[in-house]
Each structure stands twice: as C-alpha cells, then as structure tokens.
C-alpha cells in the first residue's frame, strides 16, 4: 500500500482498506516506511488516514535514520503528524548502544522528549571508561528533552554484579539530572551505599558526563594518615582555563591545623609544553617548593628543555612526601636545574649542550651546589668508501664545572673511532675490530678528580673480537653455545682511578669502555675469554643459561679500579647463571669469584616462585672480601586469594647493619568499581634529621568518584 499524500508505504501479506472509515488494516507481519524517516516493523497494524495515527497491540520496532532503535513490547499509538508515541512499555537502544526502558510512556520523536514511569538505563559496559563495568541507572519516573533529562527516585551504579550478591556501591538520589547543555550529571539528596549499607549523605554533587574530556571541577579527594604528620585531607580542584591551559589546586589540610597548598599549572604552546608545580607549607617556618619544566622545538631539528627546581627547606620534600603528589620530582635529595639544547645539524651530525645546577640537599650550604656551564656533546658519522669495510665517528665532549665552593674543572675530550664491519670465515667465526684515538684535555683547581692543573694527553686502544656461534637441535630443545675471544691493546698512559667503585660483570665484560670512563682508556694489553650458553625449549623460551668470562693481563696496573680486578694479571671470574626449573620456579644468579675460586666477592641471587595464585621473589645481594662488606635482601610477595582479593608484602633490609629500610603489608579488595585496602607501612631514613614514618592506612576508592585514605585505627574508632 502506497500513500503518496501522507508519504507512507505499507508492505504486508494481507491488508484491508476500509474506504468508508478511511482506514488500512494489516493482518500479518508488516513493514511500514514513514516519510523516509522511520522504518516500522510490526503486525496487525491499523493506519487511520483521517487522524494520521498508526497503532498496533503487537510488539513493534521502529528504527530512525541516526541508528536509534525503539521497541514497543505492548504495542503503540503513533501520532504521525506530531510524531508522538504512546506505549505501555518502551525499550530504546541509542546510537551509543545504551539501553533504556520505560513504562506508561510518551515519546516525542520530533523534539526528543520522553515522559514515563519505571525507567531503567542500561549503559554500554565501557561507557564510564571500564569495559568490566555494568553501569545502570533506575528511577521511578523520567522527563527528558534536548536540554535536560530528569529521573526521580534513582539508583545509580557502575558496578558489575556478576557472581555477587549485591553491587559494590550504589548512589540513591531523589533527583538525577543530566544537564546536556553543561554536560553534567547532577545528583540531589543522595545516600551513598556500600554493600547495601548507607555510608554518607550528599545534599548535592555533580560530575562531568562521559563525553567530557576536560572540564573544571573537583577531582578525586583522598584522606591519609601518618604517624609523623597525622591525618590529612586533600581536595584537588581542576580548572580548565582554556583548551591549552589548565590549573590544578591541591590543598592538603591536616587535623592539627597545618596545611600545604600545592598547585600545578600546565600550558601547551604551538611548539612547546610547560608544566609547573609549587607548594607552600606554613608551620613554624614557611617551607615551599617550585618545580617547572618547559620543553619544545625551534624548527624541525632543534629541541630544547628548561628545568627549574627549588625548595626553601632541605628536608621539606621528604617530610611531606611531595613526590607522591607530582610527576616532576625524581629525587628528594638532589635538585637539578638546567637549560639544554639538542640540534640535528644533518643526518650524520648532532650537537647537544646543557647548562646545569645541582643542589645536594644533604650537604652544608657552602658545599651543596655544583655548577656546570656548559657541557656539550658533538658527534659526527663520516661516510667512508666501501673498501674500508667499516665506519668512522668523531665524538667531542666536554664541560666546565665548579663545585664545593672552590673546586674547578674544565675538560674537553675528543674521540676518533673506527669500527669495522663483521668478517665471517668459512667455518663461521665472526670477527670485528675497532680503533680508538682519544685526545684528553683538562684544567683544574683544587680538584678531587684530577691531580694535574693542566693535563693534555693522547690515548689509544685497539680491540679485536671473535666469536663462534654454535647451534645444536635436540629432540626436545635447542642448545646455543658462543665462545668469545677479545684482544685489547692500549699502549698509552692511563690515570689513577683505583678508588673508583666500578665493578665488571658479564654484561659489560666485552664492552670497549668497561671501566666506565670518558676521560681515559683502560691501559695495558689483555685477553678477555668467555662463553655464552643457552638452552631453549620447543617454544623458543629460555630454560637454562650460563655465561662465564675472565680477563688476562700481561702485567699488573695499580691505577685501574680495585673492584674490577683489572689491576691484576687475572680478573675475577664473572658470570651469570639462569635456570627456569619449571613454570613455577626461576633463578637468576650474577657472581664475581676470585680468580682461584677460593671465595666470592659479589653475589646477586634472584629467585622467583609462583604457584597458582601465589608469587614471591627474593633478591639477595652481597659484597665480601675484596669488594667490601654489605648484605641486602629484598622480598616482594603477592597472594591472589581470588580475582578480587590480594595480599601484598614488600621489604628491603640491610642485613649487615640490621637496618630495615622499608616494609609494607597490604590487603586489597578490588572490583571493577571499588578498591578497599588495609596497608601497614614503615619507612626508615638514614638521615638523622628525619623520624621513621609508620602508618596503618585504610584506603577505599569508589571508582570513578572518590578515594578515602586514613589511619586504620581512626576509621575503626569512628
């Protein structure tokens, strides 16, 4: 049936047209297209051409042109002129795949208005940012238009109820409003319930709807307890100044009337970004900090970065744990301010330069500052003819430094380095060689590093390295073996760096600069021998590994670092042993044994054991005999009782001094919408001016709304 006048098309197996009443009846499944705007699927439809009303008592589906779907379970009455639908029960799936249901409702398709009872909104799972959520909003009645949606007597939660008796939290409100103009969710006269128990009452609060990426408003508040500082409440407020600027105010209030006002400012420019963090604490004496970073570009090939760090009290950062509240703080004991430039002159040439100021907060005022103005790094790769079978690089580095009030150093170091390509023999031996010519220049006054006031030296090193990669395939595994030989010749003089704390291990044994110095080379002639063995299973996973190496010298050299044993004719035997016994147990052992295997100077043992939901790892590090006298043990243990219940334990202890640096025991209950934990933590400081901090903390996060953190005893008392 086609009605050109009213722009209606009806398709059905059987239809009756009553010419007297001007009505069309369908008596089977029916498809109807209205004004090229709506597609209607139903059965037994009545179309009254006089009143322009479509009605049916059967289940009916309507789809519009913007991917919204309407299902009327108990039929409908559709006024096609006003585009108003009345129905006893409506289901809607919008273009964002959210589901809505109403009873005894009226729906105005033209003005996007809804009025109904017993409303239920079943949001798509990731609507609030977590695909494990099952967000839902229910109410007794709804009135909605293009500007606002109001739902009365509502219950809202994002919690997943799968395999649970109840949702983790619910928000019961007298009135819920979605302000579509301001893009706000607003709640009036609300009770916040946790596991069906009323926790606190909120007369009013709001938060941005999920379409908002940046909007001014309060961020997650949190409450924290500390044995040193007492309890504190932080209520951060985010202010979006513009699309490129924002400001976050993070006031921290203590129960003893102390406070810290901390703020963060960010701004994005066309070719740069600025971030600044600063705070003020006024108790006895005013303490504050100011940290800022500006980084950007000049054109396509030049990067720059400016960093400024300042505090007015040396222990302020540690005492108040400022680092926890900003990403700008890397160290609580050393401040670093600098201006740096990095320029790519061409594809083979690069220049970096920096002016720096270091401030060591653990030292007296007169000796705490170190100035570097500037340091630089210039590198150039020089393309050679193919006949040279290698590449050439020129590297120039240097700095000018003043430290500890009256100590001065200026250094320029020039490296001319040739590295050959690999040579592979018919039997598979892979060899390469390198030549280094180093020109070192320094001027110093009262230096603790350089003895000579004026020093100009030339150093040279020749390295030849050969290795033979071998592979053997077995029925259940594959073995790899690689013997390594390195010849080193450095006929020029060196410097006395015997007191350096440098230590060699297998990972740097064959490195050209294994002593870790840019101002000299390793003097003398040596042969370095070693091998790497690895066993892999059929999945190409490593199950066993052993690496060993040793350095042979033609004579002693007391100027080289004692810990490296490169000052002897034979170094320590250094290596690594890795063994994965099974999927549950993994061992990793790094060692440095005396050349005669009489004793061990260094041991680092890492053991990781996991069984089902239990995993623990131990890291034991000891230095003995020639390397000193230290012994540290660390442990991290995690027991996953279930997907939502976890126990964690961390500890670090100095066994020689019987000094526990840190330990923490925590229990966590975490779901898709709720995190609750008890945490006992104690932190010790070797700095005598700081008192150990001990806290028993209860933490609860209502995701995505709020966080409460406090001393556990105060939670129980109240």
Task: Specify the residue positions occupied by each region the protein language model found.
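Structural signature for solvent-exposed beta-strand/loop edge elements and short helix-capping sites
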Residues: 1-337, 447-448, 626-628, 643, ...
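Outer-membrane beta-barrel translocator/pore domains, especially the C-terminal barrels
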Residues: 103, 113-115, 138-139, 143, ...
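Structured loops at beta-to-helix junctions and adjacent beta-edge loops in soluble globular domains
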Residues: 154, 190, 222, 240, ...
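Carboxylate/His-rich catalytic cores and anion/metal-binding grooves
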Residues: 181-218, 304-306, 357-407
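Residues in well-ordered beta-strands of folded domains
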Residues: 193, 220, 238, 277, ...
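Conserved aromatic-histidine-acidic binding/catalytic patches
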Residues: 253, 329, 366, 454, ...
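Recognizes the extracellular SEMA beta-propeller fold with strongest preference
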Residues: 290-317, 331-357, 370-378, 383-390
């Amino acid at each position: 049936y086609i009605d050109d006048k009213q722009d209606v098309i009806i398709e059905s197996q059987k239809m009756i047209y009553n010419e007297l009443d001007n009505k069309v009846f369908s008596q089977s499944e029916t498809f109807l297209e209205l004004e090229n705007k709506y597609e209607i699927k139903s059965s037994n439809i009545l179309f009254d051409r006089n009143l322009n009303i479509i009605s049916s008592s059967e289940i009916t589906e309507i789809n519009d042109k913007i991917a919204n779907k309407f299902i009327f379970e108990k039929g409908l009455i559709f006024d096609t002129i006003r585009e108003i639908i009345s129905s006893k029960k409506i289901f809607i799936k919008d273009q964002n795949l959210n589901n809505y249901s109403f009873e005894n409702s009226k729906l105005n398709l033209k003005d996007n208005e809804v009025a109904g009872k017993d409303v239920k909104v079943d949001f798509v799972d990731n609507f609030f940012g977590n695909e494990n959520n099952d967000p839902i909003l229910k109410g007794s009645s709804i009135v909605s238009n293009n500007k606002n949606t109001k739902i009365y007597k509502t219950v809202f939660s994002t919690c997943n109820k799968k395999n649970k008796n109840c949702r983790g939290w619910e928000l019961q409100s007298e009135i819920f409003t979605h302000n579509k103009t301001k893009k706000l969710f607003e709640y009036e006269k609300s009770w916040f319930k946790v596991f069906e128990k009323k926790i606190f009452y909120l007369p009013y609060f709001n938060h941005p709807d999920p379409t908002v990426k940046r909007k001014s408003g309060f961020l997650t508040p949190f409450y924290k307890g500390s044995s040193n500082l007492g309890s504190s409440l932080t209520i951060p407020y985010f202010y979006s100044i513009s699309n490129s600027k924002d400001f976050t105010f993070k006031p921290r209030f203590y129960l003893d009337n102390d406070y810290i006002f901390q703020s963060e400012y960010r701004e994005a420019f066309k070719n740069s970004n600025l971030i600044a963090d600063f705070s003020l604490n006024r108790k006895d004496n005013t303490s504050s900090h100011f940290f800022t970073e500006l980084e950007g570009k000049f054109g396509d090939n030049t990067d720059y970065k400016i960093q400024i760090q300042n505090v007015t009290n040396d222990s302020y950062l540690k005492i108040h744990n400022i680092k926890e509240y900003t990403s700008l703080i890397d160290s609580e004991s050393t401040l670093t301010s600098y201006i740096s430039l990095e320029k790519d002159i061409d594809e083979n040439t690069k220049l970096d330069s920096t002016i720096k100021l270091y401030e060591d907060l653990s030292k007296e005022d007169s000796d705490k500052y170190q100035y570097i103005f500037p340091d630089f790094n210039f590198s150039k790769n020089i393309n050679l003819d193919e006949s040279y079978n290698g590449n050439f690089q020129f590297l120039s580095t240097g700095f000018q430094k003043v430290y500890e009030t009256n100590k001065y150093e200026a250094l320029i170091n020039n490296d001319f380095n040739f590295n050959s390509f690999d040579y592979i023999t018919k039997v598979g031996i892979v060899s390469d060689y390198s030549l280094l010519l180093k020109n070192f220049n320094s001027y110093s006054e009262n230096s603790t590093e350089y003895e000579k006031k004026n020093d100009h030296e030339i150093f040279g090193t020749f390295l030849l390295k050969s290795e033979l990669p071998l592979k053997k395939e077995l029925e259940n595994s594959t073995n790899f073996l690689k013997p390594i030989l390195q010849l080193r010749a450095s006929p020029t003089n060196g410097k006395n760096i015997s007191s350096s704390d440098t230590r060699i291990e297998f990972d740097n044994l064959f490195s050209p600069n294994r002593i870790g110095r840019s101002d000299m080379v390793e003097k003398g002639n040596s042969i370095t021998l070693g091998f790497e063995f690895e066993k892999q299973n059929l999945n190409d996973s490593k199950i066993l590994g052993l690496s060993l190496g040793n350095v042979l010298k033609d004579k002693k050299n007391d100027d080289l670092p004692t810990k490296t044993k490169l000052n002897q004719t034979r170094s320590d035997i250094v290596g690594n042993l890795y063994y994965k016994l099974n999927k549950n147990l993994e061992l990793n052992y790094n060692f440095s044994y005396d050349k005669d295997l009489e004793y061990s100077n260094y041991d680092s043992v890492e053991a990781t054991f996991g069984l089902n939901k239990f995993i623990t790892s131990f890291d034991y590090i000891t230095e003995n005999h020639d390397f000193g006298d230290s012994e540290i043990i660390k442990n991290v243990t995690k027991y996953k009782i279930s997907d939502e219940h976890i126990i964690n334990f961390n500890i670090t202890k100095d066994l020689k001094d019987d000094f526990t640096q840190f330990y923490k025991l925590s229990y966590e209950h975490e779901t898709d919408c709720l995190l609750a934990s008890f945490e006992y933590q104690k932190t010790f400081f070797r700095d005598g001016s700081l008192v150990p901090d001990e806290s028993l903390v209860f933490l609860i996060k209502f995701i995505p709304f709020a966080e409460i953190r406090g001393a556990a005893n105060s939670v129980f008392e109240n």
